[in-house]
Amino acid sequence: AISDHVMYQLKEMNPLFSKVIFISNSQLSEKYVSVLFSKDLIQEFIQRENIGYDFAAWKAGLELEGLDNLEKYDSVTVMNDTCFGPLWDIVGYYEKYENDPEIDFWGMTNHAEVKGHNLYIPEHLQSYFISFKKRLATSNVFRKFWESVVAHTDVQKVIDEYETQYTKIFMKAGFAYTAVLDTVPIHQDYFHRNFTIHYPQVLLDYKVPFIKIKTFDLSQHLSPYTLKTIEEKSSYPIDLIDSHMTSVSIPTPAYLLDRKVIEPSNKIVSVDKKVAVHLHTFYVDLLP
C-alpha cells in the first residue's frame, strides 16, 4: 500500500515537475501503481529489490532517465518518503533557490560538522530532499558520484559513503549549496546536531516545509507542540500525521491519546453480543 501522506505529497508537488519517477523498494500491487498513473501523479514507475536504500533507488531512477538526458531539465530533485509535507506551498522555495545563480544544489536542512575523538562527520546537506540545478546535474563530478553508488545492505554504509559525503564532493568541485534551515551558524546553541529529529520546533520556526516522520516518536515530549503548531500555522491535513503514526507506532503513543478521545453521545445502542474490556491501569489512584 501507499501511505496517504505520500499520495498527498505527490499531489501537492506534482505541478512543479515535468516528469516524476516513482521508485519503490517494497513490493507494490498493480492496483496501487495504476492509481498513481491514473491520477497523473507519476510518469514512470520502478519496482526494485529492497537493497541500497534511497541512494541506490535514486541511481536507478537517474539511469532510467539517462544521465545524458538531464541536459533538458532545469533541475533534478531527489527525495524520499521519510517526511510529512509540504507543510506550506513549495513553489516559493523553488522560485527562490532555482533563480539564485550562486546556488547549484539546495535542500531543507544541513548537518553541521562533527569532530569527535573517534568520530568525524563532515558538514552536509541532509538527503531526504535535494534539488540539483542543471549546471551540477550535467557535470562530470555528478555523473561520477552516481556511477560510484553501490546497493549496500547496511544503512550505515549508505550514510557514511554517500549521504555525508556527496556535499563535500560537489563543493570541492566548485559547486555551492544552501538549505532552508542552515544549522551551521546556530548549532552551537543546541546540544544535538541533527535538528530534523531533536528540534522540530526550530524547523517550524524557519518554515522548513517538511518534517521528519521519526521526530514524532524520537522526540515524543515535543510532539504535542509539533502537532499543534502544524495544525495552527499550516494548511497540512493533520489527520495524515495522526493516522500514519497510529499505524506505525504500536501501542498508540501518549502524544496522540488526546486526539482519540471519543465525544460522549446520548445515543442508545443495543448490542446482543458480549463485549470484553481490558483496561490496564498503572496508577490505580487515577481510577474514579
Where do the PLM segments sit?
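ER/Golgi luminal nucleotide-sugar-dependent glycosyltransferases, focusing on the catalytic module
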Residues: 1-288
